[in-house]
């Protein structure tokens, strides 16, 4: 497979991620132009942290669906599994947002100041169906990716951004609602619209490749138990990944200048998400295209190119006036918030490149059904992050610098671990990294 073939398969998925990550800055820009912008921005960061934490077990249904949706029986099985998980996560969201459990989590565990916490609850209540909408559309997107319909995934993100952006602008102009209420409503409008589009866009695959009249695919029959054990490590990996955001916000809430740090962190996080989007699109590309040594080498080369490219882009953004223009003019952040955010971005400079490398290794392991190893790597990442935040917080490091340093160190350690494991399990060759002799297990 040529580099251009990989590029054209990957490009719509990258575009989809870019559009999704652009949603956050659009929402933040609207909040920054409404009353009490610092409080509302801090509350929005916590709402999103909790929402994505609750949805985390279902995020990797995209990888599961891409890897396993091979015929009508497996499609039906994964659909049933997805609906079960969606129902469970909706119940959890209701318990957290509508019961006293909210005070325990937000007030006691996260240590969020009361003036911020009072706005977090209604925002989370509005997002009751967030996990269900995400679950349904990611399941269907996995089907589209498996059958080379990645453009439809990108168009779904266009629909989402149009609905969320249109809703936030309309409500900001036509109502006097608080910023967090407008933001949560806009986010829900976007994900529901995208789920609806995915339901419409997947119909050709249901009539052709996944038609009930088609003979079952070759290989062993997938059972609910098999599906559960395949997805469980991926679900745990997503849980661990998304625990990072509440972990960081909790640490920032306990350090000096908590309100400013919590207001700046969503801006830093959103920019880092946008720049890391090329890496987030890689796992499903690797899962779908891994087929033989030649493809593996071409995917490896493509990964290195993407990692180098986005590292350069991050450096240009952070080290030139572009970052100041974006934070102060586009986002209209207060000067003190923009200054903190720029410092945080500077310290996150190594993160995007390492994210791409880790995404490639995860995709390679998932393609060969070593999902537990992916989970182990993320567990290491979370452990290093937690330990680093605790240590740097004890040393009274500035909040965003401590958070950025912890994230960089954690993903670097995870990268080393995954490199070691793919050499063992998949006999990958890294001449520049000879700390272990490869021992194929397949």
What would you call each of these model-derived segments?
Residues 11-63, 232-288, 313-314, 348-355:
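Transmembrane helix-bundle signature of multi-pass secondary active exporters and lipid flippases
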Residues 43-94, 137-145, 264-317, 358-366:
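Small-residue-rich hydrophobic transmembrane alpha-helices
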Residues 1-11, 116, 180-188, 193-242, ...:
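Interhelical loop/hinge segments that connect adjacent transmembrane helices in multipass membrane
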Residues 123-125, 155-170, 174-207, 398-424:
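Hydrophobic alpha-helical transmembrane segments
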């Amino acid at each position: 497979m040529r580099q251009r073939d990989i590029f054209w398969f990957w490009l719509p998925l990258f575009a989809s991620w870019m559009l999704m990550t652009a949603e956050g800055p659009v929402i933040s820009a609207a909040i920054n132009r409404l009353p009490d912008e610092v409080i509302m921005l801090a509350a929005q960061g916590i709402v999103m942290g909790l929402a994505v934490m609750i949805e985390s077990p279902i995020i990797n249904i995209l990888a599961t669906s891409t890897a396993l949706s091979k015929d009508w029986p497996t499609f039906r099985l994964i659909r049933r599994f997805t609906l079960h998980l969606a129902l469970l996560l909706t119940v959890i969201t209701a318990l957290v947002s509508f019961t006293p459990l909210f005070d325990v989590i937000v007030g006691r565990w996260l240590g969020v100041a009361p003036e911020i916490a009072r706005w977090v609850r209604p925002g989370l209540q509005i997002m009751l169906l967030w996990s269900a909408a995400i679950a349904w559309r990611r399941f269907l997107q996995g089907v589209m990716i498996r059958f080379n319909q990645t453009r439809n995934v990108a168009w779904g993100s266009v629909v989402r951004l149009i609905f969320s952006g249109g809703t936030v602008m309309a409500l900001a102009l036509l109502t006097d609602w608080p910023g967090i209420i407008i933001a949560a409503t806009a986010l829900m409008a976007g994900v529901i619209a995208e789920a609806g589009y995915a339901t419409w866009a997947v119909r050709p695959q249901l009539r052709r490749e996944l038609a009930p009249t088609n003979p079952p695919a070759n290989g062993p029959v997938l059972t609910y138990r098999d599906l559960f054990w395949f997805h469980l490590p991926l679900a745990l990996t997503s849980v661990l990944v998304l625990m990072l955001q509440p972990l960081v916000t909790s640490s920032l809430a306990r350090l000096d200048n908590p309100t400013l740090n919590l207001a700046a962190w969503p801006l830093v996080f959103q920019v880092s998400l946008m720049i890391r989007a090329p890496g987030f699109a890689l796992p499903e590309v690797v899962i779908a295209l891994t087929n033989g040594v030649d493809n593996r080498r071409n995917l490896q080369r493509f990964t290195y190119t993407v990692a180098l490219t986005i590292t350069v882009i991050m450096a240009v953004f952070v080290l030139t006036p572009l970052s100041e223009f974006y934070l102060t003019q586009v986002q209209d952040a207060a000067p003190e918030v923009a200054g903190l955010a720029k410092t945080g971005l500077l310290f996150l400079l190594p993160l995007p490149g390492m994210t791409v490398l880790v995404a490639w290794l995860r995709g390679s392991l998932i393609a060969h059904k070593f999902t537990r190893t992916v989970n182990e790597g993320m567990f290491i990442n979370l452990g290093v992050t937690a330990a680093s935040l605790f240590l740097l917080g004890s040393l009274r490091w500035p909040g965003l610098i401590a958070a950025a340093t912890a994230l960089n160190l954690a993903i670097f350690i995870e990268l080393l671990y995954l490199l070691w494991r793919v050499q063992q399990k998949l006999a990958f060759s890294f001449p520049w990294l000879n700390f272990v002799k490869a021992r194929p297990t397949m």
